[in-house]
Protein backbone atom coordinates (compact mmCIF):
# COMPACT_ATOMS: atom_id res chain seq x y z
CA UNK A 1 0.00 0.00 0.00
CA UNK A 2 2.77 2.37 0.90
CA UNK A 3 4.78 1.44 -2.18
CA UNK A 4 1.92 2.12 -4.55
CA UNK A 5 1.25 5.49 -2.97
CA UNK A 6 4.86 6.62 -3.35
CA UNK A 7 5.00 5.21 -6.85
CA UNK A 8 2.18 7.45 -8.17
CA UNK A 9 1.70 10.52 -6.03
CA UNK A 10 5.35 11.36 -5.48
CA UNK A 11 6.14 11.09 -9.17
CA UNK A 12 3.21 13.37 -10.02
CA UNK A 13 4.29 15.92 -7.45
CA UNK A 14 7.85 15.79 -8.76
CA UNK A 15 6.54 16.33 -12.28
CA UNK A 16 4.53 19.37 -11.21
CA UNK A 17 7.59 20.86 -9.50
CA UNK A 18 9.60 20.60 -12.74
CA UNK A 19 6.79 22.28 -14.71
CA UNK A 20 6.82 25.47 -12.64
CA UNK A 21 7.82 28.38 -14.90
CA UNK A 22 7.54 26.31 -18.10
CA UNK A 23 5.26 27.14 -21.05
CA UNK A 24 2.54 24.48 -21.12
CA UNK A 25 -0.34 23.76 -23.48
CA UNK A 26 -3.46 22.41 -21.74
CA UNK A 27 -6.07 20.62 -23.88
CA UNK A 28 -9.58 20.68 -22.45
CA UNK A 29 -12.56 18.38 -22.87
CA UNK A 30 -14.41 20.92 -25.05
CA UNK A 31 -11.70 20.65 -27.76
CA UNK A 32 -10.02 23.92 -26.79
CA UNK A 33 -6.31 24.48 -26.17
CA UNK A 34 -4.97 27.05 -23.71
CA UNK A 35 -1.30 28.13 -23.53
CA UNK A 36 0.37 29.78 -20.54
CA UNK A 37 3.00 29.61 -17.80
CA UNK A 38 2.53 26.87 -15.18
CA UNK A 39 2.30 28.49 -11.73
CA UNK A 40 0.91 26.05 -9.15
CA UNK A 41 -1.35 23.10 -8.52
CA UNK A 42 -3.51 21.74 -5.70
CA UNK A 43 -3.92 18.26 -4.28
CA UNK A 44 -6.01 15.84 -6.19
CA UNK A 45 -7.86 14.82 -3.04
CA UNK A 46 -8.87 18.40 -2.19
CA UNK A 47 -12.58 18.86 -1.62
CA UNK A 48 -12.76 22.24 -3.43
CA UNK A 49 -10.66 23.95 -6.12
CA UNK A 50 -8.68 20.90 -7.21
CA UNK A 51 -6.73 21.86 -10.35
CA UNK A 52 -3.82 23.85 -11.80
CA UNK A 53 -3.10 27.58 -12.07
CA UNK A 54 -1.51 29.16 -15.22
CA UNK A 55 -0.81 32.82 -16.04
CA UNK A 56 -0.33 34.90 -19.21
CA UNK A 57 -2.79 32.68 -21.01
CA UNK A 58 -4.11 32.81 -24.54
CA UNK A 59 -6.24 30.49 -26.64
CA UNK A 60 -4.65 28.58 -29.48
CA UNK A 61 -6.30 28.14 -32.87
CA UNK A 62 -8.82 25.32 -32.79
CA UNK A 63 -12.24 24.38 -34.17
CA UNK A 64 -13.90 26.96 -31.92
CA UNK A 65 -11.25 29.69 -32.07
CA UNK A 66 -9.94 31.41 -35.20
CA UNK A 67 -6.27 32.47 -35.31
CA UNK A 68 -7.27 36.15 -35.55
CA UNK A 69 -9.68 36.21 -32.63
CA UNK A 70 -8.75 38.56 -29.76
CA UNK A 71 -8.42 35.67 -27.31
CA UNK A 72 -5.73 34.11 -29.54
CA UNK A 73 -3.73 37.32 -29.86
CA UNK A 74 -4.01 39.09 -26.51
CA UNK A 75 -2.83 37.65 -23.19
CA UNK A 76 -5.28 37.41 -20.31
CA UNK A 77 -4.88 37.19 -16.55
CA UNK A 78 -4.43 34.09 -14.42
CA UNK A 79 -6.62 31.12 -15.23
CA UNK A 80 -7.61 28.24 -12.95
CA UNK A 81 -8.38 24.95 -14.70
CA UNK A 82 -9.89 22.08 -12.65
CA UNK A 83 -8.54 18.57 -13.04
CA UNK A 84 -11.81 17.21 -14.39
CA UNK A 85 -11.60 19.57 -17.45
CA UNK A 86 -8.03 18.64 -18.39
CA UNK A 87 -7.41 16.06 -21.08
CA UNK A 88 -3.65 16.49 -21.56
CA UNK A 89 -0.83 18.83 -20.49
CA UNK A 90 1.92 19.23 -23.10
CA UNK A 91 5.27 20.87 -22.43
CA UNK A 92 8.41 21.17 -24.59
CA UNK A 93 12.11 21.30 -23.60
CA UNK A 94 11.42 20.38 -19.98
CA UNK A 95 14.38 18.92 -18.04
CA UNK A 96 13.11 16.15 -15.81
CA UNK A 97 15.68 14.01 -13.92
CA UNK A 98 15.14 11.55 -11.17
CA UNK A 99 18.83 11.49 -10.17
CA UNK A 100 21.01 14.33 -9.02
CA UNK A 101 24.00 14.89 -11.34
CA UNK A 102 27.32 13.89 -9.78
CA UNK A 103 26.01 11.33 -7.34
CA UNK A 104 28.04 8.12 -7.10
CA UNK A 105 25.00 5.91 -7.49
CA UNK A 106 24.07 7.39 -10.87
CA UNK A 107 26.48 5.06 -12.69
CA UNK A 108 27.16 1.39 -12.25
CA UNK A 109 26.17 0.89 -8.68
CA UNK A 110 26.29 -2.90 -9.02
CA UNK A 111 30.09 -3.13 -9.44
CA UNK A 112 32.73 -2.16 -6.89
CA UNK A 113 36.06 -0.53 -7.72
CA UNK A 114 38.98 -2.95 -7.95
CA UNK A 115 42.55 -1.84 -7.31
CA UNK A 116 44.99 -2.71 -10.09
CA UNK A 117 48.74 -2.73 -9.49
CA UNK A 118 50.71 -2.02 -12.65
CA UNK A 119 54.11 -2.66 -11.03
CA UNK A 120 55.72 -3.74 -7.81
CA UNK A 121 55.97 -1.48 -4.82
CA UNK A 122 59.70 -0.96 -5.25
CA UNK A 123 59.29 0.78 -8.59
CA UNK A 124 58.10 3.98 -6.91
CA UNK A 125 61.60 4.70 -5.66
CA UNK A 126 63.65 7.41 -7.36
CA UNK A 127 66.49 6.55 -9.69
CA UNK A 128 68.89 8.71 -7.72
CA UNK A 129 68.34 6.56 -4.62
CA UNK A 130 69.81 3.46 -6.26
CA UNK A 131 73.58 2.93 -6.04
CA UNK A 132 75.36 3.48 -9.36
CA UNK A 133 78.46 1.66 -10.48
CA UNK A 134 80.28 3.30 -13.37
CA UNK A 135 81.89 1.12 -16.01
CA UNK A 136 80.51 -2.24 -14.86
CA UNK A 137 77.23 -2.47 -16.73
CA UNK A 138 77.11 -3.32 -20.43
CA UNK A 139 73.84 -3.00 -22.26
CA UNK A 140 74.77 -5.48 -24.96
CA UNK A 141 75.60 -8.16 -22.42
CA UNK A 142 72.39 -7.45 -20.51
CA UNK A 143 70.27 -7.80 -23.65
CA UNK A 144 72.00 -11.01 -24.64
CA UNK A 145 71.59 -12.46 -21.16
CA UNK A 146 67.99 -11.44 -20.67
CA UNK A 147 66.51 -11.72 -24.17
CA UNK A 148 69.07 -13.75 -26.11
CA UNK A 149 69.74 -10.94 -28.59
CA UNK A 150 73.28 -10.67 -29.80
CA UNK A 151 74.36 -7.24 -30.88
CA UNK A 152 76.06 -6.40 -34.17
CA UNK A 153 77.45 -3.10 -32.95
CA UNK A 154 81.04 -2.29 -33.83
CA UNK A 155 82.87 0.79 -32.75
CA UNK A 156 84.58 1.10 -36.12
CA UNK A 157 81.23 1.99 -37.74
CA UNK A 158 81.09 5.30 -35.86
CA UNK A 159 84.72 6.27 -35.19
CA UNK A 160 88.23 5.70 -36.38
CA UNK A 161 89.65 2.30 -35.61
CA UNK A 162 92.68 2.57 -33.39
CA UNK A 163 95.59 0.26 -33.30
CA UNK A 164 96.45 0.05 -29.62
CA UNK A 165 99.77 -1.61 -30.36
CA UNK A 166 101.06 1.56 -31.96
CA UNK A 167 100.19 3.78 -28.96
CA UNK A 168 103.26 4.43 -26.85
CA UNK A 169 103.39 4.69 -23.09
CA UNK A 170 104.11 8.41 -23.23
CA UNK A 171 100.91 9.00 -25.22
CA UNK A 172 98.87 6.98 -22.79
CA UNK A 173 100.30 8.90 -19.84
CA UNK A 174 99.57 12.22 -21.60
CA UNK A 175 95.95 11.18 -22.29
CA UNK A 176 95.40 10.13 -18.69
CA UNK A 177 96.82 13.41 -17.43
CA UNK A 178 94.51 15.47 -19.66
CA UNK A 179 91.52 13.39 -18.61
CA UNK A 180 92.22 14.00 -14.94
CA UNK A 181 92.61 17.73 -15.55
CA UNK A 182 89.29 17.91 -17.35
CA UNK A 183 87.48 15.93 -14.70
CA UNK A 184 89.00 17.89 -11.83
CA UNK A 185 88.61 21.31 -13.46
CA UNK A 186 85.81 23.65 -12.54
CA UNK A 187 82.69 23.84 -14.67
CA UNK A 188 82.28 26.47 -17.37
CA UNK A 189 78.61 27.17 -16.77
CA UNK A 190 75.56 26.55 -14.69
CA UNK A 191 74.47 23.60 -16.83
CA UNK A 192 77.74 21.78 -16.19
CA UNK A 193 77.48 22.38 -12.47
CA UNK A 194 73.96 21.00 -12.41
CA UNK A 195 75.05 17.93 -14.39
CA UNK A 196 77.81 17.28 -11.86
CA UNK A 197 75.30 17.65 -9.05
CA UNK A 198 77.00 20.70 -7.69
CA UNK A 199 74.12 22.23 -5.80
CA UNK A 200 73.75 25.98 -6.12
CA UNK A 201 73.34 27.88 -2.90
CA UNK A 202 69.93 29.58 -3.12
CA UNK A 203 70.33 29.57 -6.94
CA UNK A 204 72.98 32.24 -6.42
CA UNK A 205 70.38 34.97 -7.03
CA UNK A 206 69.68 33.86 -10.62
CA UNK A 207 66.24 33.67 -12.15
CA UNK A 208 64.77 30.70 -13.97
CA UNK A 209 65.74 32.01 -17.39
CA UNK A 210 69.39 32.36 -16.47
CA UNK A 211 69.43 28.91 -14.85
CA UNK A 212 67.78 26.87 -17.60
CA UNK A 213 67.07 28.90 -20.75
CA UNK A 214 69.72 31.51 -21.44
CA UNK A 215 72.83 30.78 -23.44
CA UNK A 216 75.88 31.94 -21.52
CA UNK A 217 78.87 33.07 -23.49
CA UNK A 218 82.14 34.34 -22.14
CA UNK A 219 82.12 38.13 -21.94
CA UNK A 220 85.04 39.63 -23.81
CA UNK A 221 86.35 42.94 -22.63
CA UNK A 222 86.21 45.35 -25.55
CA UNK A 223 87.44 48.93 -25.53
CA UNK A 224 84.72 51.57 -25.31
CA UNK A 225 83.45 53.07 -28.52
CA UNK A 226 84.94 56.43 -29.47
CA UNK A 227 83.07 58.49 -32.10
CA UNK A 228 85.11 59.42 -35.19
CA UNK A 229 86.60 62.89 -35.20
CA UNK A 230 89.68 64.69 -36.46
CA UNK A 231 91.25 64.44 -33.04
CA UNK A 232 90.23 60.87 -32.33
CA UNK A 233 92.25 58.21 -30.63
CA UNK A 234 95.57 57.22 -32.05
CA UNK A 235 95.58 54.42 -34.57
CA UNK A 236 97.68 51.35 -33.98
CA UNK A 237 99.63 51.58 -37.25
CA UNK A 238 99.78 55.36 -37.36
CA UNK A 239 103.33 56.68 -37.94
CA UNK A 240 104.77 58.95 -35.25
CA UNK A 241 104.40 62.71 -35.83
CA UNK A 242 107.27 64.72 -37.24
CA UNK A 243 109.23 66.64 -34.57
CA UNK A 244 108.60 70.40 -34.41
CA UNK A 245 112.32 71.20 -34.87
CA UNK A 246 112.31 69.65 -38.35
CA UNK A 247 110.09 72.38 -39.79
CA UNK A 248 112.54 75.31 -39.33
CA UNK A 249 115.35 73.19 -40.76
CA UNK A 250 113.59 72.88 -44.10
CA UNK A 251 112.62 76.56 -44.29
CA UNK A 252 116.02 77.95 -45.36
CA UNK A 253 116.17 75.51 -48.28
CA UNK A 254 113.13 77.06 -49.94
CA UNK A 255 113.81 80.67 -48.96
CA UNK A 256 116.36 81.40 -51.75
CA UNK A 257 113.89 80.22 -54.37
CA UNK A 258 111.40 82.90 -53.32
CA UNK A 259 113.99 85.69 -53.08
CA UNK A 260 114.24 86.58 -56.81
CA UNK A 261 110.53 87.46 -56.96
CA UNK A 262 109.90 90.78 -58.78
CA UNK A 263 109.12 93.85 -56.72
CA UNK A 264 105.98 94.63 -58.75
CA UNK A 265 104.25 91.47 -57.63
CA UNK A 266 100.85 92.00 -55.93
CA UNK A 267 100.85 92.00 -52.13
CA UNK A 268 98.55 88.98 -51.96
CA UNK A 269 101.08 86.78 -53.77
CA UNK A 270 103.93 87.48 -51.34
CA UNK A 271 102.64 85.36 -48.42
CA UNK A 272 101.78 82.52 -50.77
CA UNK A 273 105.27 82.54 -52.28
CA UNK A 274 106.95 82.87 -48.91
CA UNK A 275 105.12 79.85 -47.45
CA UNK A 276 107.24 76.75 -48.10
CA UNK A 277 105.49 73.67 -49.46
CA UNK A 278 105.12 70.88 -46.90
CA UNK A 279 107.40 67.89 -47.25
CA UNK A 280 105.97 64.73 -48.82
CA UNK A 281 105.95 62.91 -45.50
CA UNK A 282 104.00 65.67 -43.78
CA UNK A 283 101.47 65.81 -46.65
CA UNK A 284 100.74 62.12 -46.45
CA UNK A 285 100.32 62.36 -42.69
CA UNK A 286 97.92 65.29 -43.08
CA UNK A 287 95.87 63.29 -45.57
CA UNK A 288 95.74 60.40 -43.14
CA UNK A 289 94.57 62.74 -40.41
CA UNK A 290 91.82 64.24 -42.60
CA UNK A 291 90.58 60.80 -43.65
CA UNK A 292 90.69 59.46 -40.13
CA UNK A 293 86.92 59.76 -39.72
CA UNK A 294 86.30 57.51 -42.73
CA UNK A 295 86.41 53.78 -42.82
CA UNK A 296 89.82 52.22 -42.88
CA UNK A 297 89.03 49.93 -45.84
CA UNK A 298 87.35 52.65 -47.94
CA UNK A 299 89.39 54.29 -50.67
CA UNK A 300 88.69 57.97 -51.34
CA UNK A 301 86.90 58.48 -54.65
CA UNK A 302 87.35 61.84 -56.34
CA UNK A 303 84.86 63.04 -58.93
CA UNK A 304 86.03 64.52 -62.20
CA UNK A 305 83.99 67.66 -61.64
CA UNK A 306 82.44 68.76 -58.39
CA UNK A 307 80.09 71.74 -58.48
CA UNK A 308 80.35 72.20 -54.71
CA UNK A 309 84.01 71.67 -54.02
CA UNK A 310 84.97 71.63 -50.39
CA UNK A 311 88.14 73.34 -49.34
CA UNK A 312 90.80 71.55 -47.36
CA UNK A 313 89.94 73.49 -44.21
CA UNK A 314 86.16 73.04 -44.47
CA UNK A 315 84.32 74.25 -41.38
CA UNK A 316 80.73 73.00 -40.94
CA UNK A 317 79.96 75.82 -38.49
CA UNK A 318 80.85 78.55 -40.99
CA UNK A 319 78.27 80.67 -42.85
CA UNK A 320 76.52 78.88 -45.73
CA UNK A 321 77.77 79.28 -49.26
CA UNK A 322 76.21 82.23 -51.13
CA UNK A 323 76.09 82.09 -54.95
CA UNK A 324 77.84 84.94 -56.75
CA UNK A 325 76.35 87.09 -59.45
CA UNK A 326 77.88 86.39 -62.90
CA UNK A 327 80.56 88.94 -63.75
CA UNK A 328 80.63 90.54 -60.30
CA UNK A 329 82.01 89.89 -56.87
CA UNK A 330 79.04 91.07 -54.78
CA UNK A 331 76.61 88.34 -53.65
CA UNK A 332 73.00 88.53 -54.70
CA UNK A 333 71.24 89.86 -51.62
CA UNK A 334 68.03 91.41 -52.86
CA UNK A 335 66.24 89.31 -55.45
CA UNK A 336 63.74 92.01 -56.40
CA UNK A 337 66.47 94.59 -56.96
CA UNK A 338 68.41 92.23 -59.19
CA UNK A 339 65.25 91.34 -61.11
CA UNK A 340 64.44 95.02 -61.73
CA UNK A 341 68.00 95.65 -62.82
CA UNK A 342 67.87 92.74 -65.27
CA UNK A 343 64.61 93.99 -66.78
CA UNK A 344 65.87 97.56 -67.17
CA UNK A 345 69.11 96.40 -68.82
CA UNK A 346 67.35 94.04 -71.20
CA UNK A 347 67.13 95.48 -74.72
CA UNK A 348 64.75 92.77 -75.90
CA UNK A 349 62.08 93.68 -73.34
CA UNK A 350 58.58 94.39 -74.69
CA UNK A 351 57.92 98.10 -75.26
CA UNK A 352 54.28 99.17 -75.27
CA UNK A 353 52.98 102.05 -77.38
CA UNK A 354 53.70 105.49 -75.89
CA UNK A 355 50.17 106.84 -76.48
CA UNK A 356 48.34 104.09 -74.67
CA UNK A 357 45.82 105.75 -72.31
CA UNK A 358 46.50 105.57 -68.63
CA UNK A 359 42.84 105.93 -67.72
CA UNK A 360 41.37 102.85 -69.39
CA UNK A 361 39.13 102.24 -66.42
CA UNK A 362 36.80 104.97 -67.72
CA UNK A 363 35.69 102.76 -70.61
CA UNK A 364 33.31 99.87 -70.34
CA UNK A 365 34.69 98.08 -73.35
CA UNK A 366 36.89 98.45 -76.42
CA UNK A 367 34.71 97.75 -79.43
CA UNK A 368 36.29 97.91 -82.88
CA UNK A 369 33.06 97.30 -84.77
CA UNK A 370 31.71 99.72 -87.34
CA UNK A 371 28.83 100.67 -85.03
CA UNK A 372 31.17 102.00 -82.36
CA UNK A 373 33.34 103.89 -84.86
CA UNK A 374 30.40 105.47 -86.66
CA UNK A 375 28.66 106.42 -83.45
CA UNK A 376 31.88 107.90 -82.10
CA UNK A 377 32.15 110.07 -85.23
CA UNK A 378 28.53 111.17 -84.88
CA UNK A 379 29.06 112.08 -81.24
CA UNK A 380 32.26 113.97 -82.03
CA UNK A 381 30.64 116.11 -84.73
CA UNK A 382 29.54 119.66 -83.89
CA UNK A 383 25.81 120.54 -84.16
CA UNK A 384 26.31 122.46 -87.42
CA UNK A 385 26.57 120.15 -90.44
CA UNK A 386 27.82 122.82 -92.87
CA UNK A 387 31.39 122.79 -91.54
CA UNK A 388 34.16 121.12 -93.41
CA UNK A 389 34.91 117.65 -92.05
CA UNK A 390 38.69 117.94 -92.70
CA UNK A 391 39.26 120.90 -90.41
CA UNK A 392 39.45 118.82 -87.26
CA UNK A 393 42.93 117.35 -87.44
CA UNK A 394 44.67 117.88 -84.13
CA UNK A 395 41.75 118.55 -81.84
CA UNK A 396 38.08 117.71 -81.99
CA UNK A 397 35.42 119.67 -80.15
CA UNK A 398 32.69 118.11 -78.09
CA UNK A 399 34.76 114.98 -77.35
CA UNK A 400 34.91 113.71 -73.79
CA UNK A 401 38.20 114.14 -72.01
CA UNK A 402 38.70 110.42 -71.85
CA UNK A 403 38.50 110.19 -75.63
CA UNK A 404 40.81 113.17 -76.04
CA UNK A 405 43.47 111.35 -74.10
CA UNK A 406 42.94 108.33 -76.26
CA UNK A 407 43.59 110.18 -79.54
CA UNK A 408 46.94 109.86 -81.27
CA UNK A 409 49.25 112.74 -82.12
CA UNK A 410 47.36 113.32 -85.38
CA UNK A 411 43.90 113.52 -83.86
CA UNK A 412 42.72 109.92 -84.42
CA UNK A 413 43.50 106.57 -82.91
CA UNK A 414 46.38 104.60 -84.41
CA UNK A 415 45.53 102.16 -87.11
CA UNK A 416 46.34 99.15 -84.97
CA UNK A 417 44.14 100.19 -82.02
CA UNK A 418 40.41 99.80 -81.63
CA UNK A 419 37.98 102.60 -80.92
CA UNK A 420 36.87 102.62 -77.27
CA UNK A 421 33.25 102.66 -76.29
CA UNK A 422 32.39 105.50 -73.92
CA UNK A 423 29.81 104.98 -71.23
CA UNK A 424 27.83 108.07 -72.35
CA UNK A 425 27.21 106.52 -75.77
CA UNK A 426 26.19 103.06 -74.61
CA UNK A 427 22.46 103.07 -75.47
CA UNK A 428 21.74 104.34 -78.95
CA UNK A 429 24.90 104.36 -81.01
CA UNK A 430 24.17 100.92 -82.54
CA UNK A 431 20.99 102.12 -84.27
CA UNK A 432 21.62 105.67 -85.52
CA UNK A 433 24.27 105.26 -88.26
CA UNK A 434 24.36 103.33 -91.48
CA UNK A 435 26.01 99.95 -91.43
CA UNK A 436 29.64 99.60 -92.49
CA UNK A 437 30.45 103.12 -93.60
CA UNK A 438 33.95 103.91 -94.81
CA UNK A 439 36.28 104.85 -91.99
CA UNK A 440 39.74 106.35 -92.31
CA UNK A 441 41.97 106.13 -89.26
CA UNK A 442 45.18 107.79 -90.41
CA UNK A 443 44.54 111.26 -88.95
CA UNK A 444 41.62 112.78 -90.94
CA UNK A 445 37.92 112.16 -91.45
CA UNK A 446 36.72 111.01 -94.84
CA UNK A 447 33.63 112.49 -96.52
CA UNK A 448 30.66 110.58 -95.17
CA UNK A 449 26.92 111.03 -95.17
CA UNK A 450 25.84 111.64 -91.62
CA UNK A 451 22.22 111.83 -90.65
CA UNK A 452 21.53 114.31 -87.85
CA UNK A 453 19.98 112.84 -84.74
CA UNK A 454 16.23 113.23 -84.80
CA UNK A 455 14.04 113.57 -81.72
CA UNK A 456 11.05 111.27 -81.83
CA UNK A 457 7.66 112.47 -80.69
CA UNK A 458 4.21 111.05 -80.91
CA UNK A 459 2.42 112.25 -84.10
CA UNK A 460 -0.60 114.46 -83.68
CA UNK A 461 -3.92 113.27 -84.87
CA UNK A 462 -4.30 113.89 -88.59
CA UNK A 463 -0.54 114.32 -89.13
CA UNK A 464 1.90 111.99 -90.79
CA UNK A 465 4.26 110.08 -88.57
CA UNK A 466 8.02 110.40 -88.56
CA UNK A 467 9.73 108.75 -91.48
CA UNK A 468 11.73 105.74 -90.37
CA UNK A 469 15.48 105.93 -90.66
CA UNK A 470 17.80 103.29 -92.11
CA UNK A 471 18.43 100.43 -89.75
CA UNK A 472 15.09 100.74 -87.92
CA UNK A 473 12.66 97.84 -87.79
CA UNK A 474 9.52 98.49 -89.84
CA UNK A 475 6.09 97.94 -88.41
CA UNK A 476 3.83 95.10 -89.51
CA UNK A 477 0.91 97.32 -90.44
CA UNK A 478 -1.36 100.12 -89.38
CA UNK A 479 -2.02 98.53 -86.01
CA UNK A 480 0.96 96.75 -84.48
CA UNK A 481 0.13 93.59 -82.56
CA UNK A 482 2.96 93.95 -80.06
CA UNK A 483 4.83 96.68 -78.24
CA UNK A 484 8.14 97.57 -79.85
CA UNK A 485 11.03 98.80 -77.69
CA UNK A 486 11.28 102.56 -77.40
CA UNK A 487 14.04 104.06 -79.50
CA UNK A 488 16.78 105.89 -77.62
CA UNK A 489 16.76 109.68 -77.61
CA UNK A 490 19.86 111.48 -78.78
CA UNK A 491 21.57 113.96 -76.47
CA UNK A 492 21.61 116.70 -79.12
CA UNK A 493 20.40 119.91 -77.50
CA UNK A 494 19.83 121.68 -80.86
CA UNK A 495 16.55 119.82 -81.52
CA UNK A 496 13.26 121.48 -80.69
CA UNK A 497 11.69 120.63 -77.33
CA UNK A 498 8.48 118.60 -77.19
CA UNK A 499 5.18 120.55 -77.26
CA UNK A 500 3.41 121.31 -74.02
CA UNK A 501 0.50 118.92 -73.44
CA UNK A 502 -2.94 120.53 -73.55
CA UNK A 503 -5.43 120.36 -70.72
CA UNK A 504 -8.54 118.30 -71.29
CA UNK A 505 -11.53 120.36 -70.06
CA UNK A 506 -14.31 117.96 -71.02
CA UNK A 507 -16.62 116.97 -68.16
CA UNK A 508 -16.10 113.58 -66.65
CA UNK A 509 -19.63 112.41 -67.31
CA UNK A 510 -19.31 113.12 -71.05
CA UNK A 511 -15.99 111.26 -71.47
CA UNK A 512 -16.35 107.79 -72.93
CA UNK A 513 -14.23 105.00 -71.45
CA UNK A 514 -10.63 104.99 -72.61
CA UNK A 515 -9.37 102.23 -74.87
CA UNK A 516 -5.84 100.98 -75.06
CA UNK A 517 -4.02 101.20 -78.38
CA UNK A 518 -0.51 99.89 -78.91
CA UNK A 519 1.96 101.60 -81.25
CA UNK A 520 5.57 102.59 -81.77
CA UNK A 521 7.52 105.54 -80.39
CA UNK A 522 6.06 107.99 -77.89
CA UNK A 523 2.56 107.32 -76.60
CA UNK A 524 -0.25 109.86 -76.51
CA UNK A 525 -3.82 110.08 -75.29
CA UNK A 526 -6.24 111.17 -78.08
CA UNK A 527 -9.67 112.59 -77.34
CA UNK A 528 -12.62 111.72 -79.57
CA UNK A 529 -14.03 114.26 -82.09
CA UNK A 530 -17.10 115.46 -80.21
CA UNK A 531 -17.67 119.02 -81.60
CA UNK A 532 -15.81 118.65 -84.89
CA UNK A 533 -12.53 119.79 -83.38
CA UNK A 534 -9.59 117.50 -83.11
CA UNK A 535 -7.00 117.79 -80.40
CA UNK A 536 -4.18 115.67 -79.18
CA UNK A 537 -2.28 115.48 -75.96
CA UNK A 538 1.18 114.08 -75.69
CA UNK A 539 2.34 112.08 -72.73
CA UNK A 540 5.87 113.03 -71.88
CA UNK A 541 6.32 109.99 -69.75
CA UNK A 542 5.84 107.58 -72.66
CA UNK A 543 3.76 104.41 -72.74
CA UNK A 544 1.09 102.85 -74.95
CA UNK A 545 -1.36 104.98 -76.90
CA UNK A 546 -4.91 105.45 -75.71
CA UNK A 547 -7.72 106.58 -78.04
CA UNK A 548 -10.99 107.96 -76.77
CA UNK A 549 -14.00 107.86 -79.07
CA UNK A 550 -17.15 106.06 -79.99
UniProtKB/Swiss-Prot annotation:
InterPro entries: ATXN2-like, LsmAD_domain, Sm, SM_dom_ATX
Compositionally skewed regions (Pro residues) per UniProt: 263-281
Entry keyword Kinase: no
Segments of skewed composition (Basic and acidic residues): 214-223
Localization in the cell: Cytoplasm, Cytosol; Cytoplasm, Stress granule
UniProt keyword annotations, A-Z: Cytoplasm, Translation regulation
Keyword Cytoplasm: yes
Region annotation Disordered: where it falls in the sequence: 201-296, 441-550
GO molecular function, one term: protein-RNA adaptor activity
Segments of skewed composition (Low complexity): 244-262
Cellular component, GO annotation: cytoplasm; cytoplasmic stress granule; cytosol
BP GO annotations: mRNA stabilization; post-transcriptional regulation of gene expression; regulation of translation; stress granule assembly
Role played: Involved in post-transcriptional regulation of gene expression. Promotes mRNA stabilization by bridging poly(A)-binding protein to mRNAs.
Entry similarity comment: Belongs to the ataxin-2 family.
Subunit structure: Forms a complex composed of at least MKT1, PBP1, XAC1 and LSM12. Forms a complex composed of at least MKT1L, PBP1, XAC1 and LSM12. Within the complex, interacts with MKT1 (via C-terminus); the interaction is direct. Interacts (via C-terminus) with ZC3H11; the interaction is direct.
UniProt protein name: PAB1-binding protein 1
Organism: Trypanosoma brucei brucei (strain 927/4 GUTat10.1)
Gene: PBP1
